[in-house]
């Protein structure tokens, strides 16, 4: 059984770094070059343990032997061999003990044969104690029952460096049921995928399952009035007028189909409108012409893969609210193209008619979800209880109360008591503490409300590590919300911390967890573990509410399918946290989403059909729109700069019209074009100007004298810096900010240190102040002279192949747009000038700036990639040099003057590999300097 499972589900090959995709890590377990051996044995099971011991002696490596209990018992003499004093490394034997042979439990015979017959003739049942067998042979034995136990046992056995038998307790019936669920899940997934493909016409004629393109994207800033402040605010934050702001995304497909999405960050999370707009402007540029595959609506990592491969950005770098709005707009566009609703689109063929019937029976309606009302407990117990009684009379079956905002938990408990006295138990009560209580206060509240039948208490404690402790001490049902919002990386591994039965629900806000794909992943984990998946919103407009209604219904279908797989009764209908619609005094459309009492159930519900109809007929109320953005048009022009007996025709590209001027300098082989997405993203905050540096792209050098003068002139860092200073003075009378990458970063650093009267600050991306000693510079000069000769002798393409094969570019080579980036490196008109610029501006030719750093007068921001070990260390040393003053106020000022940021998931070419964090950092740097 174990071997068959490994053959079926294990992966024993190394994943290609070239095709790496940023999907959830649980989908791609990685085994690095593990050598696997096996012996069939007589009758399939004899002598396996002895063979493993011989293999360990022969290969002189540590061996892990995984074996079933029956095979183990057929070779117990191997334990005697194991105990012999033979020169070899320790062996770890993992015995899967299900007390018999289980293979027949997976065959049809198990369903048609009496259990007594199976036990007697097929299962080879035994009651042998493996622990006692090991004790008899003086072999260490460990018994484990869970995955965590196994991990600990493996760690201990490896630390102790001794032979060990690890017995893993298993159960034939549980194993058979697990395999049944896997088979049914695989069948369901295949059916769903086939359904998606069949729903799209002429898909067989389309390459790579791509059937449409994004023609363009635009966005609008909206502002709508609220009746009351969002419950995330404190009572004393209330102003005269309350508004909610956000963006409407509009995606146009190549067949004129349109999809709408909403991006509405909330103030209590790590996003703001300015940061969000930077990302929207970047994506607006990057998404134009992007292909969309037909499998995106499956959500199972497809969006993440598309963002990485098509847009070239790690999905984790996109703000959650932006990703949510982007997915919403694309799904709505695809649904419109297909002529279906969003819920039908993402459901595909996942749900059987039986699942839908079970759900209809549970909701007493054809397709709808129940709504949980939200109550901000600002008032006396009597006042709050009266509000709840009115909600119950209106048809709400569930209310959520905000607690932990009063002096004492007993005051909140008094409100719950009064509600039960006034309304009774005909309504479900949820309470939400928003992590505001200490463990002691949460326990105090819990002990006061034990008899009031709370459906759950949401985020009762301020420290995550106290959640399980609270569950066990209070015996109250708990729900997670902010804890889910803060999960990073491998979400499923993080969720495993919360399998405790006391955690009964996960509250999922798609705009906070990062869209529908992540929300589905979290919801499915909850449903598989028998927990409620409650969809909630963050005071968004009816556009988001309509999408969440359809998504919540999809999750209910998913839950029905899971209950069928697990042979579990379908629980009563879940009321989803979409009651924030009552806060909307205005909406972004003339008519909001219809949420009302259903005639079928007398409960407040949202109809999936109404939600679909709202999106289908969505019309923007222009009175709510503050401004519209389509796309920034770049200006392209040439400026001639003279210097002595030569001049340079600088090609410039420009975006934005603000008073702040930011000059962008590329690295060797780059051009001004590579800064286009960054400049467009920052065009609301700065006038961005990118430059083709001398010898690069379309910036030729012109000589006013003979060839001998040309040979004598060096395009050194100092010379280029002088040229750029003259260029900047021609462009603007004001000070500027420099942003430079690699070679451009060295030039920017030189100018920031030397021309502080004109340079207000500089962002140094993967830059260096040069080499400290002459010996190192001499070696580097020789290396770069050889490389320049290679460029002149064998041409640019050969040089590119050699240049980008180095270790410095390993991370860039893994980027899905690497080939596109390399093609952009061929756009240079004068190879001779390019080779001259390369050698003359070599770090071996440059004067060291290490000694000048401590005299720096302007703010500097150093940005490096997480995988760029060399430049991470250089940036750290530069910060130390700048701040190496003797205490006092000078030290404090130097610390503020120098910042360092390490960008995750990238190497040397930070701005190309992971651009969004770079854009955000540069934007904040611009804002910071504007305040000085």
Regions found by a protein language model. Give the residues of each.
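Conserved loop-alpha-helix segment in the C-terminal half of the alpha/beta-hydrolase fold
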Residues: 855-906
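Conserved alpha/beta-hydrolase catalytic His-Asp/Glu region
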Residues: 774-778, 790-852
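Thiamine diphosphate
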Residues: 9-12, 16, 23-194
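Catalytic core of soluble alpha/beta enzymes
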Residues: 401-547, 584-593
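Active-site loop/oxyanion-hole signature of alpha/beta-hydrolase fold enzymes
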Residues: 642-653, 673, 677-680, 684-739, ...
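Flexible "cap/lid" loop of the alpha/beta hydrolase fold
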Residues: 753, 758-792
């Amino acid at each position: 059984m174990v071997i068959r499972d490994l053959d079926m589900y294990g992966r024993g090959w190394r994943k290609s770094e070239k095709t790496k995709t940023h999907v959830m890590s649980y989908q791609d377990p990685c085994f690095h070059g593990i050598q696997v051996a096996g012996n069939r044995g007589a009758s399939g099971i004899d002598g396996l343990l002895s063979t493993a011991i011989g293999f360990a002696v022969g290969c002189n490596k540590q061996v892990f032997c995984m074996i079933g209990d029956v095979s183990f018992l057929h070779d117990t003499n191997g334990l005697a061999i194991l105990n012999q004093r033979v020169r070899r490394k320790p062996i770890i034997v993992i015995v899967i003990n299900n007390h018999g042979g289980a293979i027949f439990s997976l065959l049809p015979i198990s369903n048609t044969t009496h259990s007594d017959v199976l036990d007697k003739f097929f299962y080879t049942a035994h009651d042998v104690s493996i622990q006692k067998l090991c004790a008899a042979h003086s072999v260490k034995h460990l018994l484990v029952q869970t995955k965590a136990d196994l991990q600990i046992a493996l760690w201990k056995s490896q630390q102790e460096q001794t032979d060990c038998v690890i017995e893993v307790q298993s159960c034939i019936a549980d194993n058979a049921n697990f395999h049944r669920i896997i088979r049914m899940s695989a069948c369901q997934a295949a059916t769903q995928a086939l359904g998606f493909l069949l729903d799209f016409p002429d898909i067989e004629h389309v390459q790579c399952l791509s059937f449409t393109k994004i023609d363009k994207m635009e966005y609008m800033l909206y502002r709508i009035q609220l009746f009351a402040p969002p419950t995330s605010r404190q009572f004393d934050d209330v102003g005269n007028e309350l508004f909610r702001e956000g963006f409407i995304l509009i995606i146009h497909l190549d067949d004129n189909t349109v999809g709408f999405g909403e991006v509405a960050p909330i103030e209590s999370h790590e996003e703001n409108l300015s940061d969000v707009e930077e990302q929207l402007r970047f994506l607006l540029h990057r998404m134009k012409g992007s292909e969309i595959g037909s499998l995106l609506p499956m959500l199972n990592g497809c969006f993440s893969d598309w963002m990485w491969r098509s847009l070239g950005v790690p999905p984790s770098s996109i703000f959650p609210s932006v990703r949510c709005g982007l997915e919403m707009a694309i799904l709505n566009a695809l649904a419109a193209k297909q002529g279906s609703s969003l819920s039908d689109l993402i459901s595909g063929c996942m749900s059987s008619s039986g699942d839908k019937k079970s759900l209809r029976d549970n909701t007493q309606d054809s397709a709808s979800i129940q709504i949980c009302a939200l109550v901000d407990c600002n008032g006396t117990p009597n006042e709050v209880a009266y509000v709840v009684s009115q909600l119950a009379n209106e048809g709400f079956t569930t209310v959520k109360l905000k607690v932990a905002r009063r002096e004492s938990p007993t005051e909140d408990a008094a409100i719950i008591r009064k509600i039960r006295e006034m309304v009774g138990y005909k309504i479900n009560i949820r309470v939400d503490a928003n992590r505001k209580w200490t463990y002691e206060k949460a326990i105090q509240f819990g002990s006061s409300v034990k008899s009031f039948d709370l459906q759950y208490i949401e985020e009762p404690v301020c420290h995550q590590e106290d959640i399980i402790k609270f569950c066990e001490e209070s015996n109250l049902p708990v729900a997670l919300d902010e804890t889910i919002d803060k999960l990073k990386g491998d979400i499923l591994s993080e969720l495993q911390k919360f399998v405790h039965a006391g955690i009964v629900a996960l509250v999922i806000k798609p705009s906070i967890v990062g869209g529908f794909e992540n929300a589905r992943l979290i919801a499915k984990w909850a449903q598989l573990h028998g927990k409620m998946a409650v969809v909630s919103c963050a005071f968004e407009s009816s556009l988001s509410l309509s999408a969440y209604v359809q998504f919540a219904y999809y999750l209910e279908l998913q839950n029905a399918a899971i209950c069928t797989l697990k042979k579990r009764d379908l629980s009563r209908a879940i009321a989803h946290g979409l009651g924030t619609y009552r806060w909307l005094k205005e909406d972004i459309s003339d008519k909001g989403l219809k949420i009302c009492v259903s005639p079928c159930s007398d409960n407040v519900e949202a109809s999936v059909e109404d939600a679909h109809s709202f999106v289908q007929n969505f019309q923007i109320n222009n009175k709510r729109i503050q401004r519209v953005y389509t796309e920034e048009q770049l200006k392209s022009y040439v400026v001639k700069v003279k210097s002595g007996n030569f001049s340079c025709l600088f090609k410039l590209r420009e975006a934005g019209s603000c008073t702040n001027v930011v000059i962008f300098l590329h690295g060797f082989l780059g051009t001004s074009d590579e800064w286009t997405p960054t400049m467009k993203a920052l065009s609301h905050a700065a006038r961005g100007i990118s430059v083709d540096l001398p010898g690069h792209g379309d910036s030729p050098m012109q000589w006013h004298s003979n060839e001998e003068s040309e040979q004598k002139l060096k395009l050194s860092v100092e010379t280029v810096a002088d040229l750029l200073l003259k260029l900047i003075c021609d462009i603007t009378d004001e000070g500027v900010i420099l942003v430079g990458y690699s070679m451009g970063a060295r030039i920017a650093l030189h100018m920031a240190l030397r021309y502080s009267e004109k340079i207000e600050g500089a962002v140094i991306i993967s830059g260096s102040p040069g080499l400290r000693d002459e010996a190192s510079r001499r070696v580097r000069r020789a290396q770069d002279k050889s490389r320049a000769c290679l460029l002149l002798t064998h041409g640019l393409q050969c040089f590119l192949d050699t240049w980008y094969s180095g270790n410095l570019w390993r991370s860039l080579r893994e980027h899905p747009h690497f080939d596109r980036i390399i093609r952009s490196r061929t756009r240079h008109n004068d190879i001779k000038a390019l080779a001259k610029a390369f050698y003359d501006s070599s770090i071996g030719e440059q004067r060291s700036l290490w000694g000048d750093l401590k005299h720096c007068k302007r703010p500097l921001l150093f940005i490096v990639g997480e995988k760029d070990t060399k430049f991470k260390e250089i940036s750290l040393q530069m910060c130390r040099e700048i701040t190496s003053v003797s205490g006092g106020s000078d030290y404090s000022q130097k610390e503020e003057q120098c910042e360092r940021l390490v960008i995750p998931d990238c190497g040397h070419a930070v701005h190309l590999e992971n651009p969004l964090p770079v854009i955000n950092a540069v934007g904040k740097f611009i804002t910071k300097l504007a305040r000085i």
